[in-house]
């Protein structure tokens, strides 16, 4: 891609969550970003103005619902409503990071299922399709009645480590049981075995014990996760792997939320390098020397073109 794309009916708009990524995606597709503005009334209400005609157009809106989650979500919902009322033919949401995905079920009594609520809001506002990346819970796709293209960053992350020639003694590690499928996909691409961190609390008020299922002694370990938030799990896992004899520990994730003590924990951990994507825009204060960021612009740009041309996107899932 990156050549000029000749279809005036294809429009890409960006809101405020990750404009840099949106500009990269538009460049990959070969068109300019659509003209729109987001302003606020004095009481904080969001006002959106679409500054060009989109009547009969197939519109793609790029917006992650990352921090500030509620602000970014409301921007998106208001934008969808504006596009619907301006007679867009289709309204396609490109959401690299789907916020509220961790609230996908009732873990305790009287809890909401917020991932479903967000899906309802997006659909009710008028979205006709969604393209997203590595949802925390893949079953959230079932909360929608519109088509969802659920991409993953495993190929991008795997290629990074493959190009670094880390040797034959690689092991891909899942930091919990829920991430085993993701770890297995990376392991298949790197032709490496997997290991699993099994966290157990032997009895109440006793610290969790990290048991490692698999052989990591003398190995170079790559921990893969979908989200790193406070970095507690991944840094404790890295420490446990080193104590079990791993020679080096790398870590990677699709969504670097990185809140609270995350940066200090990563800096102080035995992790050699943390590789993340740009699904979430990172401010300067969240950058450290041992971090590297990969762009998902080519992946999302290719998905947009294929969807627009009614071509298959299934090869992008592999």
Swiss-Prot record:
General function of this protein: Involved in the biosynthesis of the central metabolite phospho-alpha-D-ribosyl-1-pyrophosphate (PRPP) via the transfer of pyrophosphoryl group from ATP to 1-hydroxyl of ribose-5-phosphate (Rib-5-P).
InterPro entries for this protein: PRib_PP_synth_CS (IPR000842), Pribosyltran_N (IPR029099), PRibTrfase_dom (IPR000836), PRTase-like (IPR029057), Rib-P_diPkinase (IPR005946), Rib-P_diPkinase_bac (IPR037515)
UniProt binding sites for Mg(2+) 2: 176
CC per GO annotation: cytoplasm; ribose phosphate diphosphokinase complex
Note on how the cofactor is bound: Binds 2 Mg(2+) ions per subunit.
Top-rank EC class of the record's enzyme: transferase
Presence of the UniProt keyword Isomerase in the record: no
Pathway the protein acts in: Metabolic intermediate biosynthesis; 5-phospho-alpha-D-ribose 1-diphosphate biosynthesis; 5-phospho-alpha-D-ribose 1-diphosphate from D-ribose 5-phosphate (route I): step 1/1
Cofactor(s) the record lists: Mg(2+)
Binding site for ATP: 43-45, 102-103
Organism: Listeria innocua serovar 6a (strain ATCC BAA-680 / CLIP 11262)
Assembly mode: Homohexamer.
Family affiliation: Belongs to the ribose-phosphate pyrophosphokinase family. Class I subfamily.
Coiled coil (UniProt feature): none
Keyword hit for GTP-binding: no
UniProt KW keywords: ATP-binding, Cytoplasm, Kinase, Magnesium, Metal-binding, Nucleotide biosynthesis, Nucleotide-binding, Transferase
Active site feature: 199
UniProt name for this protein: Ribose-phosphate pyrophosphokinase 1
GO molecular function, one term: magnesium ion binding
Residues binding Mg(2+) 1, per UniProt: 136
Compartments it resides in: Cytoplasm
């Amino acid at each position: 891609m990156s050549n000029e794309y000749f279809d005036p009916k294809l429009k890409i708009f960006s809101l405020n969550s990750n404009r840099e990524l949106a500009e990269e995606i538009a460049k990959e597709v070969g068109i300019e970003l659509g003209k729109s503005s987001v302003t606020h009334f004095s009481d904080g209400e969001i006002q959106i103005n679409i500054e060009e005609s989109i009547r009969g157009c197939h519109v793609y809106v790029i917006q992650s619902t990352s921090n500030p989650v509620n602000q970014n979500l409301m921007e998106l919902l208001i934008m969808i409503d504006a596009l619907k009322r301006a007679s867009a033919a289709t309204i396609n949401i490109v959401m690299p990071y789907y916020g509220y995905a961790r609230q996908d079920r009732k873990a305790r009594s009287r809890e909401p299922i917020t991932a479903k609520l967000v899906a309802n809001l997006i659909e009710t506002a008028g979205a006709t399709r969604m393209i997203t990346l590595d949802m925390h819970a893949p079953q959230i796709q079932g909360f929608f009645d519109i088509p969802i293209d659920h991409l993953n960053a495993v190929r991008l992350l795997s290629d990074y480590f493959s190009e670094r020639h880390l040797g034959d003694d690689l092991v891909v590690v899942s930091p919990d049981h829920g991430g085993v499928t993701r770890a297995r996909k990376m392991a298949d691409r790197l032709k490496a075995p997997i290991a699993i961190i099994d966290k157990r609390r032997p009895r109440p008020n006793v610290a969790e014990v990290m048991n490692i299922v698999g052989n990591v002694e003398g190995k170079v370990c790559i921990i893969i996760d979908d989200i790193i938030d406070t970095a507690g799990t991944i840094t404790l896992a890295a420490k446990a792997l080193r104590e079990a004899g791993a020679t080096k520990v790398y870590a990677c994730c699709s969504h670097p939320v990185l809140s609270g003590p995350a940066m200090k924990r990563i800096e102080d951990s035995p992790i050699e390098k943390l590789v993340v994507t740009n699904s979430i825009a990172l401010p300067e204060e969240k950058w450290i020397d041992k971090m590297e960021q990969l762009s998902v612009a080519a992946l999302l740009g290719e998905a947009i073109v294929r969807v627009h041309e009614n071509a298959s996107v299934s090869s992008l899932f592999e």
